UniProtKB/Swiss-Prot annotation:
Heme 1 (or BL or b562) is low-potential and absorbs at about 562 nm, and heme 2 (or BH or b566) is high-potential and absorbs at about 566 nm. Keywords: Electron transport, Heme, Iron, Membrane, Metal-binding, Mitochondrion, Mitochondrion inner membrane, Respiratory chain, Transmembrane, Transmembrane helix, Transport, Ubiquinone. This is Cytochrome b. The keyword Electron transport applies. The keyword Metal-binding applies. The cytochrome bc1 complex contains 11 subunits: 3 respiratory subunits (MT-CYB, CYC1 and UQCRFS1), 2 core proteins (UQCRC1 and UQCRC2) and 6 low-molecular weight proteins (UQCRH/QCR6, UQCRB/QCR7, UQCRQ/QCR8, UQCR10/QCR9, UQCR11/QCR10 and a cleavage product of UQCRFS1). This cytochrome bc1 complex then forms a dimer. Belongs to the cytochrome b family. A ubiquinone binds at H201.
Length: 379
């Protein structure tokens, strides 16, 4: 008799995706982040759902409703901080997942990669709108500054911004629609994740060597389920330490002051996971140029498969490319630091140099280095 998991119409989809899925025998812990991202998404949807039951998306009561959740709702404080710090864990896993793809050449699966880039944009949009909801000072001014960037678009810019705001400034209409979209987007993201997995399972997983592993596959369960559970336990440990010991470490103190359109905070800055892009935006003195650079800092991921000039897929056996990769990582960390600093000397020039280096490494230095490596290997 056939096992029910292989014959039942629903169970066989689960079986072919998570149980009997053939996986390369040599994938390392860098391949854990996909499953961790799935768990992060589930956690964010669950905690967000319970928070939405108590939150009110009205400018008069939004700030107080968040306070009410933390003080009066049973375990509301842990829901709120799991959701806020869960977003940070989400982005840590996202950036490590993208970094893994860059290092091991996973971007050569272009459909999977491009859906992944769209997912990154969707998650960033969701996180930005979520940051506006507590209606603190940084929520209000962050929303004002970032949405205002669209006014740099020629001809339609100003009308577009007012259309998004639902008025002539960030106000009640803006908060209500941001809450609606913040609630809706994670479900769209869930559907996109399924498409991401669909494309991934068409080709099978890449592996650290970058060499096809069709001749040496093992079932996903129990080997990688156990491995994923270990990664999950480590992530949950870090998340709970954050939530229970220093829940506000990654937040901004200004967000504990209710939004006041008449009082601008001295340093307007987004959450830490957007600081690298914010630094690139600020490094260009021209408004439209800054917006273009901001979008390109993420959109550049789409053209990476076309910039791959190496005869090898992975960087495992390419020491020169490895040096450039880690220089890029250091550069992005520098940009993250600069994004949180005031706009004054020497931070301005450091930000500009780091921004130039960021684009130079990806567009010029990496393809050239790959060609040099091909030549050295006489390929």
């Amino acid at each position: 008799m056939t096992n029910i998991r292989k014959s039942h119409p629903l169970l066989k989809i689960v079986n072919s995706s998570f149980i009997d899925l053939p996986a390369p025998s040599n994938i390392s812990s860098w391949w854990n982040f996909g499953s961790l991202l799935g768990i992060c998404l589930a956690l964010q949807i669950l905690t967000g759902l319970f928070l939405a039951m108590h939150y009110t998306s009205d400018t008069a009561t939004a700030f107080n409703s968040v306070t009410h959740i933390c003080r009066d709702v049973n375990y509301g404080w842990i829901l709120r901080y799991l959701h806020a710090n869960g977003a940070s864990m989400f982005f840590i896993c996202l950036y490590l997942h993208v970094g893994r793809g860059l290092y091991y050449g996973s971007y050569m699966y272009t459909e999977t990669w491009n859906v992944g880039v769209l997912l990154l944009f969707a998650v960033m949009a969701t996180a930005f709108m979520g940051y506006v909801l507590p209606w603190g000072q940084m929520s209000f001014w962050g929303a004002t500054v970032i949405t205002n960037l669209l006014s740099a678009i020629p001809y339609i810019g100003t009308s577009l911004v007012e259309w998004i705001w639902g008025g002539f400034s960030v106000d009640k209409a803006t908060l209500t629609r941001f809450f609606a979209f913040h609630f809706l987007l994670p479900f769209i993201i869930s559907a996109m994740v399924m498409v991401h997995l669909l494309f991934l399972h068409e080709t099978g997983s890449n592996n650290p060597t970058g060499i096809p592993s069709n001749m040496d596959m093992i079932p996903f369960h129990p080997y990688y389920t156990i491995k994923d559970i270990l990664g999950l336990l480590l992530m949950i440990t870090v998340l709970l330490m954050l939530v229970l010991f220093s829940p506000d470490m990654l937040g901004d103190p200004d967000n504990y002051t209710p939004a006041n359109p008449l009082n601008t905070p001295p340093h307007i800055k987004p959450e830490w996971y957007f600081l690298f892009a914010y630094a690139i935006l600020r490094s260009i003195p021209n408004k439209l140029g800054g917006v273009v650079a901001l979008v390109l800092s993420i959109l550049i991921l789409v053209i990476i498969p076309f910039l791959h000039t190496s005869k090898q897929r992975s960087m495992t056996f390419r020491p020169l490319s490895q040096c450039l990769f880690w220089l890029l990582v250091a550069d992005l960390l520098t940009l993250t630091w600069i994004g949180g600093q005031p706009v004054e000397h020497p931070y301005i020039i450091i930000g500009q140099l780091a921004s130039i280096l960021n684009f130079s490494i990806i567009i010029i230095l990496m393809p050239l280095t790959s060609l040099v490596e091909n030549h050295l290997l006489k390929w």
